[in-house]
Amino acid sequence: MLSSPPLSLTPPQSTRPGWPRWVVLLVAMALAGCAGLPKEVDRPVSFALAAPVDTPLGQLVAARRAAEGARHASGFALLSGPQAAYSSRLALVDAAQKTLDLQYYAIHADASSERLLLSVMAAAQRGVRVRVLLDDFHSTGRDAQVMRLAFVPNIEMRMFNPVTGARASFLGRMWGAVSDFSRVQQRMHNKLFLAD
């Protein structure tokens, strides 16, 4: 009578050791984390418009200030909801003649952002100086479409990132976040949209 080997509930042991994969992964993360910050590049200093009253938007704000019983001394206004906010941004881009200053935490790749970016590029093409300050956290993958602004004449693009490491490398970003966790939440959540 032939006997069969006893049944075992333990999984078969792998003949390949698993540690080389971990070593390769750790070395790759360490090398990506060594990238550090990019070298200094020439960034021209730019300033706000000296005489905003010379533009139609500036004249509108000046008229609002002079109005009898005006409660505000600026063009600041609260908006009622997302549709009003979006259409107001598009109107500001279309009305801008001299400058646009945009500060965002994230510009996601969607239809509304695409329309806004096309309007901003059209403003730059008609001679409006555009300055964009964007948090670097949401500027990869599909959302990297916003980076094309950096190559348009009259657009100055700056990125904010408190975490060191390679921007283009996922491993570099992860290593930077893990090795300096205290800075991960120091994001630029401010949002600003100024015209003329």
Regions found by a protein language model. Give the residues of each.
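Phosphate/adenylate-binding glycine loop and adjacent helical scaffold
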Residues: L100
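HKD-type phospholipase D/PLD-like phosphodiesterase module
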Residues: C34, A51, L57-G58, R64-A96, ...
